[in-house]
Curated annotation (Swiss-Prot):
The keyword Transport does not apply. It comes from the Eukaryota. GO terms for cellular component: nuclear speck; nucleoplasm. This is Protein FAM76A.
Amino acid sequence: MAALYACTKCHQRFPFEALSQGQQLCKECRIAHPVVKCTYCRTEYQQESKTNTICKKCAQNVQLYGTPKPCQYCNIIAAFIGNKCQRCTNSEKKYGPPYSCEQCKQQCAFDRKDDRKKVDGKLLCWLCTLSYKRVLQKTKEQRKHLSSSSRASHHEKEQYSRLSGGSHYNSQKTLSTSSIQNEIPKKKSKFESITTNGDSFSPDLALDSPGTDHFVIIAQLKEEVATLKKMLHQKDQMILEKEKKITELKADFQYQESQMRAKMNQMEKTHKEVTEQLQAKNRELLKQAAALSKSKKSEKSGAITSP
């Protein structure tokens, strides 16, 4: 019985071939938790839910420092502290001020003083380097798939030619070799047409060489368009939130104003009632005082006339 290996997410056991190479995930976990790019720092991470579009580190920074600003060097929306992202800040401390990237022309490429760190002798920024490596990896995988498929077809045709035997074997062998030779250049020509962009490269190095610069540019432009769309979406969300807050403040102000008016009307009404009561009481007291003074006068006049 073949050995089984556990998925790093669901911990169920599968054959080694059924797990992914990097994360060691099964097919269901790869679909449920795909590897996506963080909206802010642009690093790849395993998405836990479809609504979560930022990595855990950026989520913690958002809670601590609030929404980030675009970095003044690389324009990535990851400047939580100051005007520079953490990657550019650390690179600037380590390698000095940034230079212009030879791919995207932004002032965000740091010279590490080592030609081995450069991409085909070019000084590229972090995003352009990732795009280049991603395109290069895809071409390598396509080349590997092409070579494996050609070997499989060659092996099948050799087995068929062995079974046929005799003169038929020789004729089939010549046909198979000629067909394979015709097939491989056709498939190679597709990749060679992709990689030849005015530069001269050898056929063996065409797929691994930097002739895929235009693909890197296209990938970079797509990433920039996606970044701009996300920035626009975020700004629209910020505008909507601000409009919502303004509406809530207006509603709260109107409510408080109506409450104050009602309170003032109630106080005015109460004051009027108290004033009327005091005036009525004052009139009653005046009547009583007049009656007392009148009775005193009558008593005095009676006392004078009695002798």
